[in-house]
């Protein structure tokens, strides 16, 4: 992706987030974006929208189906994308919207990788640790299970990581023995 395309994507995302923020609708916008991104991930919609083989009329039909129960701001955004023929960038724009919402609200997704599934108490403790150590509000808690960690956990927030896994500790111990 070129710098020009990246700048275009970021500008669309910032504009949408600004409008939603002015109208105190960031939570609604975030829910809309997550629902549409889920549709992208369960279908090959991104490929269809970026394909030159798919006629523009077909792309209009596909995006019209996405409008469903979205907020006015999201539907206006989708109309603008269609009007300016930017369908190929929609997936990246929606991801950029989530990043902008995180920056504006200081609420980031938290990825927790552990050897076993977390209990509700552990999840609430993770949220507290994130708030204290990273000075951010935990957004979605994305839980991953990786038995190779042996024990402990890895918390990842906004490109920052806390790794207390036994696997990492064993690797560090092994390096110290050399």
Swiss-Prot record:
Keyword Repressor part of the UniProt annotation: no
Chain's role: F(1)F(0) ATP synthase produces ATP from ADP in the presence of a proton or sodium gradient. F-type ATPases consist of two structural domains, F(1) containing the extramembraneous catalytic core and F(0) containing the membrane proton channel, linked together by a central stalk and a peripheral stalk. During catalysis, ATP synthesis in the catalytic domain of F(1) is coupled via a rotary mechanism of the central stalk subunits to proton translocation.
One Gene Ontology cellular component: plasma membrane
Domain of life according to the entry: Bacteria
Pfam families per record: OSCP
Cystines in this chain: none
Membrane-related topology note: Peripheral membrane protein
Compartments reported by the entry: Cell membrane
Subunit structure: F-type ATPases have 2 components, F(1) - the catalytic core - and F(0) - the membrane proton channel. F(1) has five subunits: alpha(3), beta(3), gamma(1), delta(1), epsilon(1). F(0) has three main subunits: a(1), b(2) and c(10-14). The alpha and beta chains form an alternating ring which encloses part of the gamma chain. F(1) is attached to F(0) by a central stalk formed by the gamma and epsilon chains, while a peripheral stalk is formed by the delta and b chains.
Family: Belongs to the ATPase delta chain family.
Molecular function GO terms recorded: proton-transporting ATP synthase activity, rotational mechanism
Main location: membrane
Organism: Streptococcus pyogenes serotype M3 (strain SSI-1)
Descriptive protein name: ATP synthase subunit delta
UniProtKB keywords: ATP synthesis, Cell membrane, CF(1), Hydrogen ion transport, Ion transport, Membrane, Transport
